Amino acid sequence: MLIEERKNGVLYLGLNRPEVRNAFNASLIQALTTALSGIAESDRAVVIRGEGEAFCAGGDLNWMREQSTQSEAENAADALKLYEMFDAVYRCPVPVIAQVHGPCFGGGCGIVAAADIVVSSSSALFAFSEAKLGLIPATISPFVLRKIGSYSRELFVTAQPFDAGRGKEIGLVSSVV
């Protein structure tokens, strides 16, 4: 689910659901939130990366389907937990570096927007893909708006994919390697 490794003062967190492109479900959301809430005094930075061929595909569609049968109160509680995960990235007391490769869609872009530094491979592909599912990226919006401002409007509405170079142009990506 989540690989945690401490090395030379850096906490490495690996999203480890490669069979679903590291898509979020309740367990991964809880694991990432807990890990970021347990920063040790010796930790000087956090690196979040995806295992396998993708950084993060956003929400797991099977998990999202299950949510469609929940009550409004249950859905609100799940949305709050998701927000708290992004907020844990954003408010982490040490710098958070997102190390992006491959696809980074929806909520994956939320992690990127909440991170302090984003290092992306030149082959990474980003998209705020919620619109393709008939959804709005409400939970990640506060973090994305802080990071890229007015660029978010077009990207949210069109769900158009963009490469790491464009991500750097608009301020989502810090450096492309």
Briefly describe each language-model feature range.
Residues 23-26, 57, 66, 157-158, ...:
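Phosphate-coordinating loops and pocket residues in cytosolic domains that bind phosphorylated ligands
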Residues 13, 17, 32, 48, ...:
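Terminal peptide-recognition signature
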